[in-house]
């Protein structure tokens, strides 16, 4: 698997608890979603304090840092950059000012129209410290809140402007907000801490973050919903009307932790079922089935169970090496595979093997693992992908925004098989994948090219010449003036700026 992660977000309102440490623990549970940087912002009733830096959660924070961040509300973020450069300036949360106070925002996802929105804000003398879409969102909310003097109005106006996939958490000194894109592409769940009736709440990208802080799952944040939590309790309103539901299906395939729950089912059980379906569609006559750790293992178990073949541990993962796909260049990715994985020769030597991975994206990782297994003595190596071919780039929070990098967009199955050096190669069908996941609407644009949110027309160079989606959008630029005029017409914003 060579996909880049997206990000993890967390928010907590718990006035009588150590919100900074709760956030720190939750970010540990979400560390798999991003390893570039980490950050925490805390509201203490008077102002917002923030600490963020590049590195893992354990590298950014120590006890002294957390002791210096008392408060009643907090948000946290662990980042893998999908829009904008990496570095301290791109670490989240991002800050913006509202009159005499501050807000801090953390974001998972990607905004497809952030370039044009950044230009609009720059023309209004708003400056930026980074080139990230997340800072654009923070500055948009700050701008509209300063104009209307209502934070929820500022959030709703921003939601009317931004396009793409997003789950965002935001704090001011005395309140927590959580909101999600109207298609529900990026995940966000609500949980409760403490006894029934206590005003202690958390929001997170995955339920595994609720578990680690002792929270009980309540529900998903609805697509288009804005949740506000303060001393007055929890309230909800719709910032946008929901559109056709389009949950990112790669949360099931790869991104989410196996112990997270989506639609009432553990991600582990879904991946196990994907492996069984894969075995039905692309069986192989072998002695041993192994999984590529960690995300390929549940599917490998299901594959072996369906074919009644021995399942074994043929690859050992070095858990102290950052994930290979986090590496910024192809050369470093290739080196990273060997740093991260090693084959068990006494398990695989002399055996015909099926190696199950969650996906084949660029082909680099698969090629190197096949060679590792051959070097360890495997007589045959058959590769199976527990997801369909990744043919189309993603623009909603996964760093595959260039079709030229996707091996299945350029090669047939047989050509990929030869490229990675396997004896055979098989992919789970899209129909088979959809039969395994909970029944709901999904974004499967990376497999099908059906994009739920229109792609800006100037993204055309990111597609191969023969592959263009149907819904390239000519321009998003004019909408800014329309939203401003609507606020003026409703008496929420002064007509003279």
Predicted regions located by residue number:
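Conserved short alpha-helical segments that host acidic/polar catalytic motifs at enzyme active sites
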Residues: 1-223, 228-286, 292, 380, ...
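A conserved beta-strand->alpha-helix junction
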Residues: 130, 135-138, 311-322, 419-437
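Secondary-structure transition/capping motifs at alpha-helix termini
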Residues: 126, 147-148, 283-287, 305-312, ...
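Phosphate/diphosphate-binding loops
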Residues: 157, 208-209, 213-217, 224-225, ...
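Amphipathic alpha-helical
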Residues: 136-149, 293, 304-323
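Short, glycine/charge-rich flexible loops or terminal/linker lids adjacent to PRPP-binding catalytic cores
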Residues: 308-353, 363-364, 391-399
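Generic beta-strand/beta-sheet core signal
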Residues: 106, 171, 179-180, 191, ...
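PRPP-dependent phosphoribosyltransferase catalytic core
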Residues: 159, 174-175, 214-220, 240, ...
